[in-house]
UniProtKB/Swiss-Prot annotation:
Gene3D superfamilies: Cytochrome c oxidase-like, subunit I domain
Record-given protein name: Probable cytochrome c oxidase subunit 1
Transmembrane segments: 16-36, 57-77, 108-128, 142-162, 192-212, 234-254, 277-297, 315-335, 346-366, 380-400, 413-433, 456-476, 493-513, 591-611, 612-632
Catalysed transformations (reactions): 4 Fe(II)-[cytochrome c] + O2 + 8 H(+)(in) = 4 Fe(III)-[cytochrome c] + 2 H2O + 4 H(+)(out)
Source organism (scientific name): Bradyrhizobium diazoefficiens (strain JCM 10833 / BCRC 13528 / IAM 13628 / NBRC 14792 / USDA 110)
Cross-link (1'-histidyl-3'-tyrosine (His-Tyr)) at residue(s): H283-Y287
Biological or metabolic pathway of the protein: Energy metabolism; oxidative phosphorylation
Localization annotation: Cell membrane
Positions that bind heme b 2; high-spin: H418
CDD domains recorded: Ubiquinol_Oxidase_I (cd01662)
Subcellular location, principal: membrane
Pfam families named in the record: COX1
GO cellular component term of the entry, any: plasma membrane
Amino acid sequence: MLGKLDWSAIPFDQPIPLIAGAVVLVAILAVLVWVVVKGHLPYLWHEWITSVDHKRIGVMYILLASIMLLRGGSDAIMMRIQQAVAYQSQGYLPPEHYNQIFSAHGTIMIFFVAMPFVIGLMNLVVPLQLGVRDVAFPTLNSVGFWLTATGALLVNLSLVIGEFARTGWLAFPPLSGLSYSPGVGVDYYAWSLQISGVGTLVAGINLVTTVLKLRTKGMNYLRMPMFCWTTLASNLLIVAAFPILTATLAMLLLDRYLGFHFFTNEAGGNVMMFMNLIWAWGHPEVYILVLPAFGIFSEVVSTFSGKALFGYRSMVLATMAICVISFMVWLHHFFTMGAGPDVNAIFGIASMIIAVPTGVKIYNWLFTMYGGRIRFATPMLWAVGFMVTFIIGGLTGVLVAVPPADFMLHNSMFLVAHFHNVIIGGVLFGAFAGFEYWFPKAFGFRLDERWGKLAFWFTFLGFYVTFMPLYIAGMLGMTRRLQHYDVAAWRPWMLVAAAGMAVLTIGVICQIMQLVVSIRNREALRDRTGDPWDGRSLEWATSSPPPVFNFAFSPDVRGEDAYWDMKTHARQQSFEHDAPEYHDIEMPRNSPTGFICAFFATIMGFALIWHIWWMVILGGIGAFATFVVFAWRDHDEYVIPADEVARIDRINLEERRSLVSMAGVV
């Protein structure tokens, strides 16, 4: 009836996961009770859970990423403490628990922190920058988010029901095969990524279509903001790379469930095929994450330097070059597999070549800053911190792209430091910069600068104190994923890294405090102009937060920096006519399709993990029926009357006119 599921799945004999799970469960129940008692449930259902508004979906992606950051960050703290105290001892984490922690940490931070964060920012901002009212497929946008949330839920369920994979975040066979991982841990890993991967693929298709087909009048490709270009490149990579991940995990699941032997050498399979396939997805995944961050930094550096982005067309070419070359370097992750010097040399050279367009971007940002009137607001601090940090990560990346060096450093702590150098210094710094930069647009008030700068400095310094020692430990021969060690030379560096993690944690606490203080002081921090940073692209041409329809009139773009051009030439449509002619606007209707699909996907995923076959059938039929019902709906839109559009727009115009007049601009 319940397949493999019984009371032994609850870790009653393991106090750490049991207590952690109990705390999470109590917190969830407390939030649910508060929502119901305060009467917020109808509001949440109508305005958020069933919303297909790209802005709200973007915010929900970012909220999911923030929650999972706390979970993934907690795993990181536990690992750093374990390695600090595990010299000539077993530390406080048993090996099987430690292995689950580093596997969950990598999986969560890549798939459920970095991915949702950048997709959330893309959802929030790209339609506004393109001057359009929503993404191409609003309901599928909701489906994509809720499937991602389903994957995150399954990962967290493994904390208290069963176990997670002990294989590392890429689950290499034969360790991930039934012979070495007979439990449900790898199944939790694979099904959570399969379900969330479908959501990511849907989001990628949606954003590619939006950029290619829904630009406002006058916005040709070479007038798009750089963030739109990097969004296009990133989502093209999603569309091309995520089917590889889906197929690879499907073959692994067939090995585990039906006794296939795709990756079993002794039965005619080939374990190296898994390595090739997973990294054929895995290296483009790095650029799926970092390219949107590059776009964010382009927007931030240009805005806070008070200048147009230097070398715009070269930035476009560099972005698309990275998009293409990222598919040609995957083998540098396993030079030691024995492919031979010729193959290694080709992929090593390709890995060095991809640094060239990245270098072009760095120089263009520096030239943009040169001669500008730089304002070191919090988003700009994250941008400058990124440039310093990412250069170090890039240099160490070029080093491990040299096959002889990689033979010495492969699977060492040097590699761990390099990877975090790129992902934290590139992706997370970019996500934080974008969060600070576009927060006023999403919520109508700025974040507190004092707490923001404290968060930056603690995070920046904490990062270096945490990860620079790992480079040294790697060069001293320390391999990664060690639950304990006996080499005295490694211990001082593990102690320093643990101290650095404490500083990083203070940085996260400062970010939480920044949010709390900003919400408390939101009236004093209110943005009534819609343009708190003196921005250059179209998202700043509407109110903060924007109305549901984004723009009362489609903007007319006549240059690269569309809104800056409007401000410079006093051609804002807001000021062109005293009595513009408003029209009805058709908008997509809210839909529970995404939430219902996710509900049935959760049932099906959980049942597949525990081999509860009747529940698998129930979940599959429910998900399929939901899609059929959605497909046969005839009325998916509603109309906002012209009078209502006029009322909302005039309130915005009057407030902006009064503020502009007070500033002496008009």
